[in-house]
Amino acid sequence: MTDAPELLKGPLEDRHRELGANFAEFGGWLMPVSYAGTVSEHSATRNAVGLFDVSHLGKALVRGPGAAQFVNSVLTNDLGRIRPGKAQYTLCCSESGGVIDDLIAYYVDDDEIFLVSNAANTAAVVDALQAVVPAGLTIINQHRSHAVLAVQGPRSTDVLGELGLPTGIDYMGYVDASYAGVPVRVCRTGYTGEQGYELLPPWESADVVFDALVAAVVDARGEPAGLGARDTLRTEMGYPLYGHELSLDISPLQARCGWAIGWKKDAFLGRDALLAEKAAGPRRLLRGLRMAGRGVLRPGLTVCAGDIPIGVTTSGTFSPTLQVGVALALIDSEAAVQDGQQIIVDVRGRAVECEVVRPPFIEVKTR
């Protein structure tokens, strides 16, 4: 019997312990799951501002002549739609149309693209790129190059203003700035559905920026927030989480991510399979479920129309905003389920009535 591998640690573990964080494993990393409590942190983010350390996210750099053109030939979305100083949600797919990972591509210039991926999938993304990279380009796994600090919520702009960081940035844009001599990439991105920013300081200098952010967030009546709140926030928005709503077995079309595919491009990994699936229609589709009564839904529950199984829940939580249980579920297309329809979820042998809704469950405020 071999011992389990030791969990990786981010650059701010000591700071989180000082703040009283509870920790859990995420993608092989030991990360803060909560401080004051998930519901409190969720509400602070929706109503004021939350500060999240997501430094476990992967980073990779593609550099060399024609880097943007190469990345555009591999990842699904069309980099030709954006320009330097902009970021784009995209996917890295297998040739069979499954998802290796979903990620954000930062367009630095034609010869440099910076990628942020899910923690556990960084090596797989790098491997997929390396397998088809032409001579003259380098792909570097930079997992520990930068911390990632997400400042999310209606008062996020006030927080960045307190630090003298730029705020007049278009959604999905970014600016390279500095704080107290520390370079910081300020990105108008997030995973909560709120207006927000993601800051990328160097790994070794992250504490300088984090300490200042904590003080400014508290002054703005916000809270440090853990990955527990990040999950409830993204579930309310219907945002996919890799391993739940996206995987090698769950295609972008099934997860309603077809908008992140450049269908008119000549090439990207999985193109033929995804075009065929688009023509035929996906065999299942991501739906939202809202409980009619009290309780909480969890992943892996069977969804039924009457007594007939028609799908499975992929994520589920109690929505602090709506004060009701919500879930995301993959529902068979042949079941012809409609928004507003009542269906049943089997919760440990108990038939729980839910309404089918189209995510998001609450209003998007990212812009």
Curated annotation (Swiss-Prot):
SUPFAM superfamilies, sorted: Aminomethyltransferase beta-barrel domain, Folate-binding domain
Catalytic activity: N(6)-[(R)-S(8)-aminomethyldihydrolipoyl]-L-lysyl-[protein] + (6S)-5,6,7,8-tetrahydrofolate = N(6)-[(R)-dihydrolipoyl]-L-lysyl-[protein] + (6R)-5,10-methylene-5,6,7,8-tetrahydrofolate + NH4(+)
Enzyme Commission number(s) of this protein: 2.1.2.10
Gene Ontology MF: a single term: aminomethyltransferase activity
InterPro entries: GCS_T, GCS_T_bac, GCST_C, GCV_T_N, GcvT/YgfZ/DmdA, GcvT/YgfZ_C, TrmE/GcvT_dom1
Record function comment: The glycine cleavage system catalyzes the degradation of glycine.
NCBIfam families, per the entry: gcvT, PRK00389.1
Cross-referenced HAMAP family: GcvT
Name of the protein: Aminomethyltransferase
Name of the gene encoding the protein in the UniProt record: gcvT
